[in-house]
Amino acid sequence: MEKDLVSVYRPPISSAYIPTHSITLEEVWERITSKDLQEKTQRLRTLRSEGKEEEYKSLKKESLPSVTFGGTFDYRRIDPQEYREYLLRELEREKDPIKVSKMKGTIGLLEGKVGLLESSGFVIIDIDHISETGLSLQELKDRISEDKEIGVRLVFTSPSGDGLKVVCRVSSQITDTDSYKTAYNSLRHF
């Protein structure tokens, strides 16, 4: 696997937050297959199989870390106001003066920025509701893993147990939202 880095975010999943650190795809795989995450994932799948969809969604959001496969970020946000409020809450709890200074600086620099530090060249494809296709999860995973055309680097089962996450290398570096969309759309046939 490549040494390109991706950002990791602690739970809860939010539209605006600061990554805790960066790791390689190999380390992503190690975390996904770790005992801790396997236990959390199994708990989620049990809730789903029992028809407890709202509990499943809530626990998933609150218990699983997330990753931005597109590269490393100094922050990630969708709504600038929500992100600003998040930072202000974090400032109240943070004791490290260096982190406090960085957060205060970030609050002033938010508008119009995505926070991408370095592109990994990866795009992630979510394939949901596989059980509805008539294919087995393993069969589809095997077929995708063997496809040399789409540059597959990592394939894993989604927390629901009924989907796949497929990380692909694209030929061009992704530097902004438009280039990400172009790269993603190049894989739509998939």
Model region roles, listed by residue range:
Residues M1-G121:
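DNA replication initiation on ssDNA origins
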Residues E53, K61, E146-L154, H189-F190:
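Structural alpha-beta junctions
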Residues F122-I150:
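A short, contiguous, amphipathic alpha-helix enriched in charged residues
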Residues G134, E139-R143, V170-F190:
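Helical (often loop-to-helix) elements that flank the catalytic cores of nucleotide-handling enzymes
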